[in-house]
């Protein structure tokens, strides 16, 4: 099932749609389908397009100071901020764009906003090395978070499983500070509430740019395409859990 959840969004991504339309155009000898595919890819590769989508996804959220956070039973940091890279005879871990999730969780823990800091053992079948939460657990110890505060979920593959795993670790209707990327927060918040938890969202890792729009935002780029693809995948995820789940 996890493979299906990854493959279907890829087919519906800008690049996937472009390739399908170009292939259809070549098979039918219809240039208009090729042109449509190229047009979709071009528009989606504009930084301006990705920024509009990010703003929509992150609407209603803002960065907050840890001192302003309410107290809770647990701080929950969702996986999705590490990547394994080759290193010598094995591999090592590096931060991805979502690294703010970890640092925000640690800041809340050190501010004593909850007695427990939970990392999720997020991993995919193809992931190298230990589940992400185990790596973050050890890093938090080095960052002086008391070991007695730290906890790990069982292995999980997606946000729905993370929510269920955390709910099983806490008391019914427990209050949690939920830390994840701003664009991912609405879907995560809904899933954690469905699992029976009282959620205070703590969004980080904002992707929308506050810079003024310039002509550079209307020049297609790999970064623009990547941003648009990620944003559209999140829209698809929200639609799936809203209408199909």
Regions found by a protein language model. Name each.
Residues 27-34:
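Membrane-interface helix-boundary motifs at transmembrane edges
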Residues 47-222, 228:
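A structural signal for short, hydrophobic/glycine-enriched beta-strand patches
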Residues 23-24, 42, 239:
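Hydrophobic residues within the alpha-helical transmembrane core of Major Facilitator Superfamily
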Residues 220-245:
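Structured C-terminal subdomain patch of bacterial secreted/periplasmic proteins
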Residues 15-17, 47, 245:
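Extended, histidine- and acidic-residue-enriched regions that form the cofactor-binding/catalytic faces
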Residues 3-8, 49, 53-57, 232-239:
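Hydrophobic alpha-helical segments of integral membrane proteins
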Residues 1-27:
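Membrane-embedded alpha-helical segments of integral membrane proteins
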Residues 35-47:
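Hydrophobic membrane-insertion alpha-helices, especially the h-region
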């Amino acid at each position: 099932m996890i493979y299906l959840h990854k493959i279907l969004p890829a087919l519906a991504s800008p690049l996937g749609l472009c390739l399908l339309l170009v292939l259809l155009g070549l098979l039918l000898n219809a240039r208009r389908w090729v042109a449509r595919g190229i047009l979709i890819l071009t528009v989606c590769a504009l930084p301006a397009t990705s920024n509009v989508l990010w703003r929509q996804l992150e609407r209603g959220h803002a960065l907050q100071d840890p001192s302003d956070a309410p107290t809770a039973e647990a701080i929950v940091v969702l996986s999705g901020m590490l990547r394994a890279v080759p290193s010598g005879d094995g591999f090592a871990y590096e931060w991805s764009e979502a690294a703010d999730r970890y640092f925000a969780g640690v800041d809340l823990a050190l501010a004593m906003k909850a007695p427990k800091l939970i990392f999720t053992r997020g991993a995919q079948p193809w992931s190298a090395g230990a589940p992400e939460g185990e790596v973050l657990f050890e890093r938090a110890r080095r960052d002086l978070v008391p070991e007695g505060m730290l906890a790990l979920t069982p292995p999980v593959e997606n946000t729905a499983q993370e929510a269920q795993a955390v709910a099983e670790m806490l008391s019914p209707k427990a209050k949690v500070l939920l830390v994840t990327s701003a664009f991912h927060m609405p879907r995560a918040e809904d899933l954690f509430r469905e699992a029976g938890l009282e959620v205070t969202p703590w969004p980080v890792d904002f992707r929308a740019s506050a810079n003024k729009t310039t002509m550079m935002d209307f020049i297609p780029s790999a970064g623009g395409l990547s941003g648009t693809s990620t944003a559209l995948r999140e829209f698809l995820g929200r639609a799936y859990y809203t209408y199909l789940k």
